[in-house]
């Protein structure tokens, strides 16, 4: 990818469609393509045809927010701190964070010793404990997507009891912050035929919050060099007079090169750190895969050896023997970079991504240590 040309894959990701659809546009000459070095690219100017991508040509630059005061937040289901850290960068002060996972809490405590980190099942934290945070401005968190039990009726707050969303809503109801922020997987929009999301919005309305039109945000448009989509639900306290608009998108997505090398995103190359090792034979196989390639790039004999019985199964299997490309955003990172179905190999070296490379692609600072 250059600033003037985008790959088929990236255009598909930007438009939330498939490579097949984009290839059909190219084949039908609906959009113009070029083939430098034999690979198909779409000139950036061709993307003016899509209203969804008009921001790529906007003169309004991406602006980082500047808070008018020191807002306080509580972060629920905090994990290792990605969302809380992002809010901190935006000027918010985290006064309490909670997660059930010990390693996640240890990570938060090590990196932010002044934060009040509760390693506890959220359902075991009493209402009384949360009453001590009535001055908090924002409650945020990414509760897991769960189905609700109902018989065709519209659910109220108490009907969601037993789910982690109920716990999120319980805290919001107690503290009554100006804003609540919930992030979740894209699949929540279609979960249980859309009923899960509809009931979540109904409950937020019941406890006193107007939900801004839910939006699926693509990380590549917000200074993150990774193809990751997340659904954001923003609740605004009723009669607060507040208005919310989603931030401007950047005009040029960041790439793996930006994440791992000195340049636009970081002032230094990525520091060395631990990584899993491939077997000797796996290294020999991965040497045949070019940057941005996968098992389809292997010689036929090696394909049969590596793919075995899955060679003739359906599906693209594009995650197998997958090597990241330098000049594209990273694929969505998984918890297992060396697992065969979800491999994320270094663009050049014959190995999975390292811990610090994983962190950089998610825009964690180099001094953020993981337990």
Feature roles, as predicted:
Residues 55-178, 186-190, 195-198, 205:
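Core alpha/beta nucleotide-donor-binding catalytic domains of modification enzymes
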Residues 20-25, 49:
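DNA-binding alpha-helical recognition surfaces that contact promoter or target DNA
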Residues 26-27, 205:
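Alpha-helix C-terminal capping/helix-coil junction sites
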Residues 1-21:
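Polyanion-binding surface elements
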Residues 19-20, 281-371:
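C-terminal target-recognition/interaction regions appended to catalytic cores
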Residues 43, 232-236, 334:
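Short, well-ordered beta-strand micro-motif
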Residues 5-10, 28-56:
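Short helix-start
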Residues 128-136, 146-318:
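Class I S-adenosyl-L-methionine
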């Amino acid at each position: 990818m250059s600033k003037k040309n985008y790959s088929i894959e990236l255009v598909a990701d930007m438009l939330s469609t498939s490579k097949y659809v984009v290839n059909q546009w190219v084949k039908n000459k609906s959009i113009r393509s070029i083939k430098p070095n034999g690979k198909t690219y779409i000139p950036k100017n061709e993307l003016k045809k899509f209203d969804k991508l008009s921001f790529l040509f906007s003169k309004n630059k991406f602006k980082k927010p500047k808070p008018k005061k020191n807002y306080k937040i509580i972060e629920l289901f905090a994990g290792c701190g990605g969302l809380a850290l992002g809010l901190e960068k935006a000027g918010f002060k985290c006064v309490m964070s909670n997660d059930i996972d010990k390693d996640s809490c240890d990570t938060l405590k090590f990196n932010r010793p002044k934060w009040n980190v509760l390693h506890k099942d959220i359902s075991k934290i009493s209402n009384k404990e949360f009453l001590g945070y009535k001055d908090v401005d924002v409650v945020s968190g990414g509760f897991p997507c769960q189905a609700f039990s109902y018989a065709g009726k519209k659910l109220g707050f108490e009907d969601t009891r037993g789910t982690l969303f109920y716990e999120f809503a319980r805290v919001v109801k107690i503290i009554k912050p100006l804003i609540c922020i919930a992030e979740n997987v894209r699949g929540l929009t279609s979960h249980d035929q859309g009923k899960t999301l509809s009931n979540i919005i109904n409950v937020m309305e019941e406890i006193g919050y107007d939900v801004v039109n839910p939006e699926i945000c693509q990380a590549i448009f917000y200074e993150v060099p990774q193809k990751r989509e997340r659904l954001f639900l923003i609740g605004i306290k009723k009669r607060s007079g507040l208005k919310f608009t989603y931030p401007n998108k950047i005009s040029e997505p960041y790439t793996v090169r930006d994440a791992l090398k000195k340049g636009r995103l970081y002032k230094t190359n990525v520091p060395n750190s631990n990584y899993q090792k491939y077997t000797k034979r796996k290294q020999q196989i991965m040497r045949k895969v070019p940057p941005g390639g996968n098992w389809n790039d292997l010689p036929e004999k090696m394909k049969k050896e590596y793919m075995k019985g899955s060679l003739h199964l359906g599906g693209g299997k594009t995650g197998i023997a997958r090597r990241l490309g330098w000049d594209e955003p990273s694929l969505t990172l998984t918890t297992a970079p060396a697992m065969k179905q979800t491999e994320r190999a270094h663009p050049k070296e014959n190995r999975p991504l390292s811990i610090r490379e994983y962190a950089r692609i998610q825009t964690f600072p180099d001094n953020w240590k993981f337990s």
